[in-house]
């Protein structure tokens, strides 16, 4: 999966001119995405990698892990109940992003719901969505 993700990150940099990537820090795909962007930065040092914060930084301090350059907290999440914070942070990112690289391995997951939301936005021309194929073990 990592080589495919690396290739897609590089394609977004070259073909779409993407210079800023925002990645969460809560799952295996997030870790792979951060690694793929960090590796792409070796060839494209101008790109940035931001950590998506689902909880307000004043409420929950987060030490910025390597390889992130900075963090991003979406506006308006202060009023979202904590149990919905991660899902809402992802939805808000779709609203302020031009591109999404997604991977869903379980059809009943929150990732699938977020992808469906992004695909509806893509039909309106608001975002370009790339879905990585499921890798069979």
Task: Label the model's feature ranges.
Residues 1-137:
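Acidic/glycine-enriched connector segments
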């Amino acid at each position: 999966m990592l080589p495919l993700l690396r290739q897609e990150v590089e394609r977004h940099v070259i073909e779409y001119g993407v210079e800023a990537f925002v990645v969460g820090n809560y799952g295996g795909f997030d870790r792979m995405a951060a690694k793929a962007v960090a590796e792409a930065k070796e060839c494209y040092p101008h790109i940035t990698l931001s950590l998506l914060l689902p909880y307000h930084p004043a409420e929950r301090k987060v030490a910025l892990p390597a390889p992130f350059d900075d963090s991003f907290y979406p506006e308006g999440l202060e009023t979202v109940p904590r149990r919905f914070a991660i899902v809402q942070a992802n939805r808000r990112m779709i609203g302020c992003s031009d591109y999404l690289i997604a991977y869903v391995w379980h059809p009943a997951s929150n990732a699938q719901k977020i992808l469906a939301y992004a695909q509806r936005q893509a039909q309106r021309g608001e975002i370009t969505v790339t879905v990585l194929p499921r890798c069979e073990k």
